[in-house]
UniProtKB/Swiss-Prot annotation:
Family named by the database record: Belongs to the CinA family.
Protein name: Protein MG115
Gene3D superfamilies noted in UniProt: CinA-like
Disulfide-linked positions: none
UniProt source species: Mycoplasma genitalium (strain ATCC 33530 / DSM 19775 / NCTC 10195 / G37) (Mycoplasmoides genitalium)
Family matches, as InterPro entries: CinA-like_C (IPR036653), CinA_C (IPR008136)
Length: 157
């Protein structure tokens, strides 16, 4: 539902978007590109599951990961900046979190950090879901990101 509304708003506002996903594993990009005409607004995406990919491809600082962890608002923000620049998009969206069966970096299962950068304005989000099912968490995370992105676009229109 949100993907259709987002597609309409992006085209109306003539904005392009790029995604950098870790925890959602490409589902966010899939949702955004499942709409006819996606090439009018979707520049590209990266699934940066590995920390070295975050560092080498998205220019996340190794010190950010060392000091705050890959699952952090700091890492999500740097991923969003990196993907926005790499794909020359108006909007960069990035997410990192823990969907699976065990806590990582002393952070709970169901924890999501994401950042949406529109133009020069960054919006940082943190959510915690109460699901212990990996697939459910990934879907919930993706829906939360799409819902938040739609809300921000609505404020622009």
């Amino acid at each position: 539902m949100f993907a259709n509304l987002i597609a309409e708003k992006l085209q109306k506002l003539q904005l392009s978007v790029a995604t950098a996903e870790s925890v959602t594993g490409g589902l966010l990009a899939h949702c955004l590109t499942s709409i006819d005409g996606a090439s009018n607004y979707f520049n590209g995406g990266v699934i940066a599951y590995n920390n070295q990919v975050k560092i080498n491809l998205l220019n996340v600082q190794s010190s950010t990961i060392a000091n705050h962890g890959a699952v952090s608002s700091f890492c999500a923000r740097e991923m969003a900046v990196g993907v926005k620049q790499k794909f020359q998009a108006d909007v960069g969206i990035a997410c990192s979190g823990i969907a699976g069966s065990k806590a990582v970096e002393n952070k709970a299962i169901g924890l999501l950090f994401f950042c949406i950068i529109i133009g020069n304005k960054a919006y940082d989000f943190e959510f915690e879901m109460n699901q212990n099912n990996r697939k459910d968490n990934i879907e919930l995370f993706t829906n939360k990101i799409l819902e938040s992105f739609h809300y921000l676009l609505t404020k622009l229109a």
